[in-house]
């Protein structure tokens, strides 16, 4: 699918997808393009697109470079998969002849939000670099919202976990905690990747003054968000360690109970084993009260360590 946008009265407006209109486009957003759509861009604009396999490369030389096809940036965008788990999607940005090409394999919240804003928001410079930086700025705003949501969730989780009561809510809190840790790690990766992309853009291009200041402002926003995200990692680790501590304490209580029970019944078992041998020369076997005596001895053997443990405060 090709979404083409041109400038009209300093605003982005969507245009038709035929070749004539594509020549006037300043931004072409390609969402899972078909082979036919790739050929349209190649024949009409002379622009070849990266494959989705190339978007998975993580080395800097494969994500940020410039060649005869233009300036290329591959950047991560935060999203959620079909099961509402945190995920990252790679988007390819290419700027050539004053035109921005974006290639992605799924719908992304940052792109959807920017398209909505562009209906009423005017562009200052009306160039492809401004559109690129506006998309990055929208992405950072989304990441800031994600961090704020994690903060709010961790406040609720901390009340459940630090309460120490291991019930269904405690188990659910542990599951949510692991999800928040995964989300926070993806936010950190996205921030770092965006920082590298903007650094490359500032170094390798002659941005207009307004766009240069905009890029630096986004970099400052990233630097301000990174400590917040790092503190989230620390809080998640603290809550995880606290939860593991409570679980270990509960397990120790259970093991302590079984250890005491086994020690209590060990003397009684010894008595039962002794009289269970049934040798004829055991005088108690022919004693009228031998059986009650053995039972009483077993009870006394079990109660003696129990009373001793209670006095020692071990129970």
Curated annotation (Swiss-Prot):
- Keyword Repressor listed? The answer is no
Q: Which InterPro entries does the UniProt entry name for this protein? A: CorA_cytoplasmic_dom (IPR045861), CorA_MIT (IPR050829), CorA_TM1_TM2 (IPR045863), Mg/Co-transport_prot_CorA (IPR004488), MgTranspt_CorA/ZnTranspt_ZntB (IPR002523)
What positions does the record give for the motif labelled Probable selectivity filter?
276-278
Localization (cell): Cell inner membrane
Q: Where is this site: Essential for ion permeation?
A: 252
Has keyword RNA-binding? Answer: no
Catalytic reaction(s) noted = Mg(2+)(in) = Mg(2+)(out)
Task: Please describe what this protein does.
Answer: Mediates influx of magnesium ions. Alternates between open and closed states. Activated by low cytoplasmic Mg(2+) levels. Inactive when cytoplasmic Mg(2+) levels are high.
Protein name per its UniProtKB record: Magnesium transport protein CorA
Q: Which organism is it from?
A: Haemophilus influenzae (strain 86-028NP)
Q: What is the lineage of its organism?
A: Bacteria, Pseudomonadati, Pseudomonadota, Gammaproteobacteria, Pasteurellales
């Amino acid at each position: 699918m090709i979404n083409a946008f041109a400038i009209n009265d300093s605003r982005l407006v969507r245009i038709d997808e035929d070749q004539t209109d594509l020549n006037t486009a300043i931004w072409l957003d390609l969402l899972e393009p078909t082979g036919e759509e790739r050929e349209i861009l190649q024949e009409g604009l002379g622009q070849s697109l990266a494959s989705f396999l190339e978007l998975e490369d993580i080395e800097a030389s494969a994500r940020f470079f410039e060649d005869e096809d233009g300036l290329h940036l591959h950047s991560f965008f935060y999203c959620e998969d079909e099961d509402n788990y945190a995920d990252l999607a790679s988007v390819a940005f290419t700027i050539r002849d004053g035109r921005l090409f974006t290639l992605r394999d799924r719908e992304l919240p940052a792109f959807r939000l920017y398209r909505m804003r562009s209906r009423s928001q005017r562009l200052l410079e009306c160039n492809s670099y401004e559109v690129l930086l506006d998309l990055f700025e929208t992405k950072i705003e989304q990441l800031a919202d994600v961090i704020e949501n994690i903060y709010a969730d961790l406040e609720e989780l901390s009340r459940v976990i630090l309460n120490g009561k291991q019930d269904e809510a405690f188990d659910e809190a542990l599951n949510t905690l692991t999800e928040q840790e995964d989300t926070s790690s993806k936010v950190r990766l996205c921030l770092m990747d965006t920082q590298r992309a903007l650094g490359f853009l500032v170094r390798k291009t002659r941005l207009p003054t307004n766009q240069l200041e905009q890029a630096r402002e986004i970099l400052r926003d990233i630097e301000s968000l990174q400590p917040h995200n790092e503190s989230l990692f620390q809080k998640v680790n603290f809550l995880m360690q606290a939860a593991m501590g409570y679980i270990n304490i509960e397990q120790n209580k259970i093991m302590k109970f079984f250890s005491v029970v086994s020690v209590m019944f060990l003397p009684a078992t010894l008595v039962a084993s002794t009289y269970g041998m049934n040798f004829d020369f055991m005088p108690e076997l022919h004693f009228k009260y031998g059986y009650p005596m053995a039972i009483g001895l077993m009870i006394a053997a079990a109660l003696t360590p129990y009373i001793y443990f209670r006095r020692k405060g071990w129970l």
